[in-house]
Amino acid sequence: KENDEWIEVFINEMAAVGIQNIPLFIPKYCTDIKVHKNGFLQELPDINFEKQENKECIEATGLFLAFPYQGKISIMPTREIAFSSIVKRAADDCGTMLRFESSNTKNVLPINEKAERLTRDFALYSDTCKILIRDEKISAVLSKSYAILPAYELIELLEKQLATDHPMYTFDKGQVSHEYLMAEYLINDPEMEESFRLALNDAGGHVKTLKAGIRFSTSDVGMGKVYATLFYDANGTRMALSGRIELEHDGDSTTDKFKTQLQDLGIMFKESEEHIQLLANTDLADV
């Protein structure tokens, strides 16, 4: 989202607070909060349990994070989707920490005890991490090497390239959540689509109608890569092709690199067609 905020903090500057909601929520849990940190007892700001974002957090995992923000120590609610990345920063992503439902043989460690354990873990690490704040909640706490590739910037680059290569392109459908974004576009290029349809039929297919498109997918909460994948709708059935662009959320990856890769989309469609033609001309005795 355009109003996302990324901040970088030292892991050992963070502390975790767990507010229990089971079997009963007690408001005093949200006041006079103290954590043991580096041999000292550190006081933290109160949590306004009537605020909607805080209430939702308490009803979900109950995990809050405290860290330096805007010149002071702030405490913020976390989303459920952030939990796995938080425990990874503490190198404590085990079943005991990740379990939130009991089984016949395994019980759940209360969230306040998980938080105490996380705070102790955080103190052992002096690396930095990247915190994603979205709509007043923490959506992810990722490693220092995580490359921030804003989805809205990538979408703009893709649409500009599509407008250059396929001026008649249209948006087809998509999905969006705090975890994931997917958008599919139809290129509406009759000449190219007809050429590919004929290639499929030469290979033994019985394709009457064919539409070509591109699927874009990414995530800001730890998904390893950005993808732009080619697909065809053959007789109304959508099929992914082998050709695709991918860029890891890691190291020196940038939106400029993605922009450069997008210039190869036209070549990838052509290579897919040539691959089908090659298969059509392959003698099974040679396989």
Question: Where do the PLM segments sit?
Answer:
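Feature for intrinsically disordered/low-complexity regulatory segments and propeptides
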Residues: 1-157
